[in-house]
Every structure is written in structure tokens, then in C-alpha cells.
């Protein structure tokens, strides 16, 4: 079983290998934070309106603007983080493929090309899923708890 230190070291090594664009990553995470903030502001406006038993035109406009801003910021964040995830996977495949090519001839005799290709594609797809789905989902959930 993996220990916490092993996981952190593995993620650090993966970070060094893949060299993600930190500027884009920062922008994506900031946009995610902003989108989450707007989405959490909407229920507060509605709650206040329900407590006062009236929903003015101004509040409706603010709610619509918040929905729009949530959509824009969350959409841009998802696009940027997805793009970064694909670049990370591309780098992982490149690094892995270059290592496979440099392995001795005896290794290639023991392992079929189709098996190596299948492993490379499937393993990087699993890493893609972690970065693109589970990381973004856990980050969004964390934002909700932080802002609540």
C-alpha cells in the first residue's frame, strides 16, 4: 500500500516530468474559484428575497448575471484545465514512449508491440481520468466547503 509520503513524492515526480503550464493552471484554478463564488452567491440572494417575501427586478437581474458569470467562468475553467490535462497526458506518453524505444532489444523480444502500445494507451487514459475528472471534481467540492 502507498503511504502519504510516497503519493506526494510520486505527484512531485509526475509534476517534474510533465511540466504543466503553471500560468494556465493558475488561471484555470482562479476561474474555477470565481465561478464557484458566483454559484454560491445565487442561493444567498434567493434566500434573502424569500425572507422578505418579494423578489425585485434588481434581484432577478443580479441572479441572471450571476448565472451567466458562473457559466462563463466555470466553462473557461473547465476548458483550460481540460487543455492542461491533455497536454500533461501528451507529455507522459512522449516521455514513456521515448523510454520504451531506448529499452534493449531483448525487452522488445519478450514483449509484443501491441501489448506495449495497449499498456501505454490504457495507463495514460487512467491518468487522464484522474487529472481531468477526479481532480477537477474534488477541487470543486473543496471550493464549495471552503465558501460555505
UniProtKB/Swiss-Prot annotation:
Membrane topology note: Multi-pass membrane protein
Keyword Plastid appears in the UniProt entry: no
GO CC term (a single one): plasma membrane
Residues annotated as domain ABC transmembrane type-1: 25-148
Annotated compartments: Cell membrane
Keywords annotated in UniProt: Cell membrane, Membrane, Plasmid, Transmembrane, Transmembrane helix
Major subcellular location class: membrane
GO molecular function terms noted in the UniProt entry: ABC-type oligopeptide transporter activity; ATP binding
TM annotation in the entry: 26-46, 60-80, 127-147
Annotated InterPro entries: ABC1_TM_dom, ABC1_TM_sf, Type_1_exporter
Name of the protein: Uncharacterized 16.7 kDa protein in epiA 5'region
Gene: epiY
Amino acid at each position: 500500500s502507498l503511504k502519504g509520503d510516497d503519493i506526494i513524492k510520486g505527484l512531485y515526480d509526475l509534476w517534474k516530468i510533465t511540466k504543466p503550464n503553471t500560468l494556465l493552471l493558475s488561471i484555470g484554478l482562479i476561474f474555477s474559484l470565481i465561478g464557484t463564488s458566483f454559484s454560491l452567491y445565487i442561493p444567498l440572494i434567493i434566500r434573502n428575497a424569500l425572507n422578505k417575501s418579494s423578489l425585485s427586478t434588481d434581484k432577478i437581474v443580479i441572479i441572471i448575471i450571476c448565472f451567466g458569470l458562473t457559466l462563463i467562468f466555470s466553462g473557461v475553467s473547465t476548458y483550460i484545465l481540460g487543455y492542461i490535462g491533455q497536454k500533461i497526458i501528451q507529455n507522459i506518453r512522449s516521455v514513456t514512449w521515448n523510454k520504451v524505444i531506448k529499452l534493449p532489444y531483448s525487452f522488445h523480444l519478450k514483449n509484443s508491440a501491441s501489448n506495449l502500445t495497449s499498456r501505454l494507451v490504457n495507463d495514460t487514459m487512467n491518468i487522464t481520468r484522474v487529472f481531468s475528472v477526479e481532480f477537477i471534481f474534488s477541487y470543486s467540492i473543496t471550493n464549495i466547503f471552503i465558501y460555505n
